[in-house]
Amino acid sequence: EVIPGYGLMGPVKAALEASTRYLAAELGPKGIRVNAISPGPLATRAASGIPDFDALLQEAVQRAPLRRLVDIDEVGALCTFLAGDGAKAITGSTLYVDAGYHILG
């Protein structure tokens, strides 16, 4: 997916997802799990540099199947889950916390 005005962040995030898979394969035999978390649009300091970010937020609300944005607490809840025993069989995955926004491409 290409996001206008996002610059190099798109390719950087794609590299992060690929690195997650490779690290999971390399570190799995040592019992180390590696996953990536991809949140939906969040109002952060980094996001403030994206042109028309407010419009992006509104588009996310309109397009996401759950018709809402996520907040940082929901992202934190996923992090907590991944660190626990309930996720001990999950590795090499990118998990989305975005109200379904990513499925629409």
Predicted features along the sequence, with ranges:
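Catalytic loop of short-chain dehydrogenase/reductase
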Residues: 1-15, 20-29, 41
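Residues in well-ordered alpha-helical elements
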Residues: 17, 45, 54, 73-76
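Short-chain dehydrogenase/reductase
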Residues: 20-21, 76-79, 83
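Short, small/polar-rich loop/turn modules that mediate ligand/substrate recognition or access, typified
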Residues: 28, 33, 90-92
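A glycine/serine/threonine-rich, flexible loop-to-helix segment
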Residues: 29, 41-64, 104-105
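Conserved SDR Rossmann-fold cofactor-binding beta-strand/turn motif
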Residues: 33-43, 83, 96-98
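A conserved structural motif in NAD(P)-dependent oxidoreductases
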Residues: 64-75, 86
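Short C-terminal tail/terminal secondary-structure segment
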Residues: 80, 91-105
